[in-house]
């Protein structure tokens, strides 16, 4: 019992170190908004199947092995080995009008990718693949 009193005295100090829940929500929202902006692109085509095929081709061009591809749901999961385990999941969905929205998420060794470079490389490869498809260049 005497040992319990010093521990109880430290309890208010620990509570003072805790972040306010409102601050947590605001910090998370900013981070999520930045992540969403970095990992989402809209393409000016209503042909979701063509974009879906281009996503698969782009991931393969970048050295990924396709784990799962579901055209009905519009999701592709892929893995790349070497320099760490990289997993990418891409969702293709219809947007407003004749647009298609592509959103990617990634993990490096089970940690969320926050570096914009892998997303930029993927979207550049996807844009090139869509351009080649539109111009029927194989």
Name the predicted role of every residue range:
Residues 1-7:
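Bacterial N-terminal signal peptides that target proteins for export
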Residues 18-138:
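Ser/Thr-rich, low-complexity intrinsically disordered terminal regions
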Residues 13-16:
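C-terminal motif of bacterial Sec signal peptides marking the signal peptidase cleavage site
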